[in-house]
């Protein structure tokens, strides 16, 4: 059993852009095949370059604001309440071209 209180978690930079901050609730190794379970804040103008994961699915649940995801070359504007699943090997990027913060909870699942 594990309980994590948000206010006790240190903010760290995400792996694709250290300026974008996240709080990791569950890190790799605690649950089999779970890469992480985290909360991220994208400030206006922040972005992550196009990348892909060879052996991981990612799921994002938008909690506030709006963001732009480009997945396989297609642009999607997402907002509060939307859920996005990105499969392994799908090139994707995220950005916040809007005027308010975008926040989301996300996790990665390793495929074996």
Locations of regions flagged by a protein language model:
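Short, surface-exposed secondary-structure edge patches
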Residues: 39, 59, 73-77
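Histidine-centered metal-chelating micro-motifs
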Residues: 47-49, 68, 84, 88-93
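Glycine- and acidic-residue-biased ligand/ion/polar-headgroup-sensing regions
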Residues: 55-57, 61-67
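Ligand-binding loop in jelly-roll beta-barrel domains
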Residues: 88-112
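Conserved short histidine dyad/triad with adjacent acidic residue
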Residues: 24, 38-53
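Short acidic-glycine-tyrosine-enriched beta hairpin
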Residues: 73-88
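A short, N-terminal "cap"/entry segment at the start of jelly-roll beta-barrel domains
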Residues: 1-35
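Structural motif
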Residues: 66-68, 75, 91, 101
């Amino acid at each position: 059993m594990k309980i994590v209180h948000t206010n006790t978690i240190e903010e760290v930079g995400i792996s694709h852009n250290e300026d974008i901050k996240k709080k990791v609730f569950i890190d790799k190794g605690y649950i089999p095949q779970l890469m992480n379970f985290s909360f991220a804040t994208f400030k206006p103008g922040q972005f992550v370059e196009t990348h892909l994961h060879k052996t991981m699915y990612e799921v994002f649940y938008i909690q506030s604001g709006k963001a732009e995801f480009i997945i396989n070359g297609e642009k999607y504007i997402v907002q509060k309440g939307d859920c996005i699943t990105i499969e392994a090997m799908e090139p994707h990027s995220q950005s916040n071209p809007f005027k308010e913060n975008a926040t989301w909870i996300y996790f990665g699942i390793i495929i074996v």
